[in-house]
Amino acid sequence: MEHVNEILATVGRILHETTTANTNVANKSTERLGAYIGAGITMVGGATVGLGQGYIFGKAVEAVARNPEVEKQVFKLIFIGSAISESSSIYSLLIAFILIFVSGA
């Protein structure tokens, strides 16, 4: 009878470890999926910055075409504004990298 109890206890431990391991794998997969989805959503910020900068540079070229004397002033302001707006794209990329590689998923 003692052997039966030992066998049942061993089988119970094995089943418990197996179900716990499968649950941990499922939880890690879900966390990883969430990190990837979050990184993708974060990079929408990078895409919108690119669209905005394209629009701004297009309008700057139109302004210079209408009034060539203001070329230096317009492009000085455009490059400063571009550098400032590019920082939000870089922050989006940084957050995406943190979500994927550092979040522990």
Curated annotation (Swiss-Prot):
Topology in membrane: Multi-pass membrane protein
Disulphide bridges: none
GO cellular component: plasma membrane; proton-transporting ATP synthase complex; proton-transporting two-sector ATPase complex, proton-transporting domain
Transmembrane feature ranges: 37-57, 82-102
Gene Ontology terms, MF aspect: lipid binding; proton-transporting ATP synthase activity, rotational mechanism
Cellular localization per UniProt: Cell membrane
CDD domains in UniProt: ATP-synt_Fo_c_NaATPase
Keyword annotations from UniProtKB, A to Z: ATP synthesis, Cell membrane, CF(0), Hydrogen ion transport, Ion transport, Lipid-binding, Membrane, Transmembrane, Transmembrane helix, Transport
Site residues, Reversibly protonated during proton transport: 86
Free-text function comment from the UniProt entry: F(1)F(0) ATP synthase produces ATP from ADP in the presence of a proton or sodium gradient. F-type ATPases consist of two structural domains, F(1) containing the extramembraneous catalytic core and F(0) containing the membrane proton channel, linked together by a central stalk and a peripheral stalk. During catalysis, ATP synthesis in the catalytic domain of F(1) is coupled via a rotary mechanism of the central stalk subunits to proton translocation. Key component of the F(0) channel; it plays a direct role in translocation across the membrane. A homomeric c-ring of between 10-14 subunits forms the central stalk rotor element with the F(1) delta and epsilon subunits.
Subunit and interaction comment: F-type ATPases have 2 components, F(1) - the catalytic core - and F(0) - the membrane proton channel. F(1) has five subunits: alpha(3), beta(3), gamma(1), delta(1), epsilon(1). F(0) has three main subunits: a(1), b(2) and c(10-14). The alpha and beta chains form an alternating ring which encloses part of the gamma chain. F(1) is attached to F(0) by a central stalk formed by the gamma and epsilon chains, while a peripheral stalk is formed by the delta and b chains.
Family: Belongs to the ATPase C chain family.
Additional observations: Dicyclohexylcarbodiimide (DCDD) binding to the active glutamate residue inhibits ATPase in vitro.
This protein's name: ATP synthase subunit c
Species for this entry: Mycoplasma pneumoniae (strain ATCC 29342 / M129 / Subtype 1)
Gene name linked to the record: atpE
